Amino acid sequence: FIQYLAPLIPHAVKAISDLI
């Protein structure tokens, strides 16, 4: 599960920092 989630974390962080 984590191995699928891990690549998404930087993508999510980038998207969130884009919003802010």
Curated annotation (Swiss-Prot):
Keyword tags: Amidation, Secreted
Tissue specificity comment: Expressed by the skin dorsal glands.
Residue pairs linked by disulfide bridges in the UniProt entry: none
Residue numbers carrying Isoleucine amide: I20
Primary localization: secreted
Compartmental location: Secreted
GO cellular component, one term: extracellular region
Summary of the function given for this chain in its UniProt record: Has no antimicrobial activities against bacteria (E.coli and S.aureus) nor against the fungus C.albicans.
Protein name, UniProt field: Kassinatuerin-2
Organism: Kassina senegalensis (Senegal running frog)
